[in-house]
Each structure stands twice: as C-alpha cells, then as structure tokens.
C-alpha cells in the first residue's frame, strides 16, 4: 500500500507540473558609475549607459535564467558572483543560469580581486564590479516581480548588418571587411508574451560582434563607454514595444564577424604596416544607423511569430575535449603574416551548456566560434529551432574553423584551440543535442 501511495503522489506531482502555467518575467537595469571613476581603462566618459538584463522562465518544475551583461567578456570569478546573486534573488541554481556577455568592445573590464592584472587600480575595479552587481540585483528583482503566465514562440529573420572581418592582403590575412567572405545573416528570435499579448521579452541571436566603436576615440582624445550595436538594437526594440518589454541580445558565432561599418577601420599600408583610420564621434551615427536597422529586423521578425502556451524547460551541461595549441596574450597577432608555426598543446576541456525551451534549443559556449561553425551546429541540430550563443558563462578567446588556420588569420593565431577543434566541437555538440532530444521525446 505504501508503494501505491508513493506512486499516486508521484503522479499527482507530475499532474501538478503539467497543469502549472508556464511563466516568464524580465527585468532591465542601467549600470551607474560614479563621476569620479573616470578616466578608467582609457574611457573618459559615457556615450550611452551600459545595462544588465535578466530573463526568468518557469514551467512549474524548473526555473531558468538568462542574464545578459554589457561587458566585453566576463571572468570565471565574476560569473560565479553573478550566479550567486541570481540564486539569492531569483531562486535559480547556478546550473540553470546562463550569464552572457553582450560583447560590447566599448566597456571597461571587471576583475575579481584575485584575478586582477598587474597595475589594475583596485579601488576603481571594485567600484566597477559593484556597479554591475547593483544593476544585476535590480534587473533580477524586476524579473521576479514581472513573473506571470506567458507564451513563447520562435521566428527566424534576416539581417545584413554584419560582414566577414578576415581580409586577404599582399602580406597575408588581416582584419577588415570582406563582402565575399562567409557570413550568417540568420536572425533568431524568441518572443515571450503575456496572455493578453503584451511582449514581455524579445531574445535575439545574431552573429556579429558589438564593435562599431572598437578602438575609436574622440577627436580630443579618450574613448567613450557604449553598449554599442547590441545595446542600440536592444534599446530600439524596447522603445518600440514599450517599458514592459526587455530585449536581450545573445551574440552568435561571431568570431570572424564584424559590424558592416566601423568607426575605426583597419588598414594595411603598402609596406605591410597595420593601423586604423578613425572618424571619431561621427562613428556614433554609424552605430545609430546599424543599431536601428538590426532593431527593425528584430521587430519585423518578432511580429510574425506564432505563440505556444506549452513550454518545457530543461538545462543540460557537459564538457567536451578538443585539441589545443599554445596561445598567450603576450604573442597575440599584430599584423598579417605569410606563414605561422602553430604549437600543439595537448587537449583542452570545453564546457557546453544546453538550454531547451520547448522546441527551441540554446547552445551556449565560451569561445567565439567562426560563423561557419555556428551554421554547422544549427543545421545538424535535431531541434526545430536552434540558437548558437558564445561568451556564455565566461570566455575562451577564438575557436576558428579549419580554413582560418590555413590562412593564418587573426582568430586562428589568437586561439588556445588547434586546427580542427571547432569542427570536432560542432560534431560533439550535435551529438549532445541529439541525446537531449531523444531523452525527452
């Protein structure tokens, strides 16, 4: 009788989960720096405010979170700190939380106290860290407060705001803009809305770095902080739908993808010397135009999405092993080369996070993948819809495709992963997706 009672209790719990409404909530908070923090990391002021955005999802059995922070990258120690805040405020375990950098190139770096590079101003670093922590707390609390029954839908559009940044020069491959190079124009959108149709959150996934203002300074000197392309597009979407909507940008496989135009463009002179030509503050006009165009593409796609009220959540984590190579910030590429000797360095562990939202799969990895690798994963996925997201739960430099190694590109030479690692990782990730799909069908 006891066994029968336990079985009935299990059935009742399962029925409760099935009957529990799918809920979602999202929050946004601006990162506020004190005026006396400047100058910092070469930045002398702010052009636009950085932000933290949090999305919470709950199917009655699992609660998951996606946090997008306007930073270039996030260290392991800071990831752990951010996840503890999400656990404290939103009751989301570290396992079920994805902390993503928006990958804006126009933001100062934040380091945990035990990971600060030599020469770092500890007091200012602490002030930066606290500003982001306060914003995360505010965004997470806003997401908790906003939780309500919701529906989810996926759509895919197209945007043309990116370009392949690997260009061939007489001296070898270097950075720039190559219209003939491979790019992935697919724009993946997850729309979450309340029962009355009010958009709660728009999640956008696109393969482009937020680097319109990368390396650009004011005409009078000094850089300006900006959320760059991801932030401008997110603000456009939020302004379009209203104050109750939060737009989260998940950077795709953008290791070799740049905004179509940049304020400080790369040049190689007749002698093979590299440099940049900067149009200074005028670059923010480019940022506005590209951000608005991407935002318009997002809205156009989101408005055509059909919604589904039944959504099952699941998070799965794994570690895959791929071949590595010697890499150090001290020997980062400084220009094009005609040849290069890669140094094998054993194997490297690569964390992979999979998040299932009904028939949508989110693949999260740390390294910046080449766009072709992102497309390979999406095409091989058994799910109806797949998003490939980089800069998730930390960063690990570049994971370039095999062709990049043959060309000695910036990404291939600035990578801890050996030639073939990206293709191997893609195959293993597809295997993980197949296992996740079969376990739940």
PLM features per residue range, with description:
Residues 1-13:
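N-terminal export signals
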Residues 15-295, 301-441:
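Conserved beta-alpha junction segments in alpha/beta enzyme cores
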